[in-house]
């Protein structure tokens, strides 16, 4: 019984069970880390280099909340591009994110969430296949964003399941954004 308890404590501490993101928002499984490294994600704003990013993941927010996303500051109207190949799963507008796009990677392992868009790309539709660098929209400040600080709110999430695919644990995307944003 002591051995079982010890194993359970070790597994729980390692993040093998659900219950929120791993410390620092890192993938819990080595296979996830390897998968994301191999994907060579592109910075999702045209013209922005990885070294230009300011890591806002896990920054403090009001009410003791944490920011589990990356904010990429850019001029309003700058193209927002797909960080990876995938399928546009949802295009929607809501009070928090404003104009948003969700892209699920082809293996359904990760969801890319793009928010505060000023406009959607012409002809963008749900179910559309996109490639790394395809335009999804433009940088804006819709939703709860400061109107004077246009930016892309970019979040990387583990694909949860077929019913709640958008509800997976967040992952800090910064270590995996290795390519300069380059609109196709």
Predicted regions and their residues:
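Surface-exposed, glycine-biased beta-strand/turn segments
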Residues: 16-99, 132, 141, 170-184
């Amino acid at each position: 019984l002591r051995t079982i308890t010890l194993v359970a404590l070790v597994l729980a501490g390692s993040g093998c069970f659900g219950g929120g993101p791993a410390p620092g928002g890192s993938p819990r499984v080595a296979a996830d880390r390897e998968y994301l490294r191999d994907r060579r994600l592109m910075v999702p704003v045209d013209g922005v280099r990885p070294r230009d990013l300011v890591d806002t993941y896990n920054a403090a927010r009001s009410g003791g909340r944490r920011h589990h996303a990356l904010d990429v500051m850019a001029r309003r109207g700058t193209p927002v591009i797909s960080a990876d190949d995938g399928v546009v799963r949802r295009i929607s507008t809501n009070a928090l994110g404003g104009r948003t796009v969700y892209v699920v990677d082809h293996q359904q392992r990760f969801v890319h969430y793009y928010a505060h868009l000023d406009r959607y790309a012409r002809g963008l539709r749900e179910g559309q296949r996109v490639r790394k660098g395809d335009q999804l929209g433009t940088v804006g400040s819709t939703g709860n964003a400061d109107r004077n600080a246009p930016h892309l709110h970019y979040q990387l999430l583990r694909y949860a399941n077929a019913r709640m695919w958008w509800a997976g644990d967040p992952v800090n995307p910064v270590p995996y954004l290795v390519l300069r944003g380059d609109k196709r």
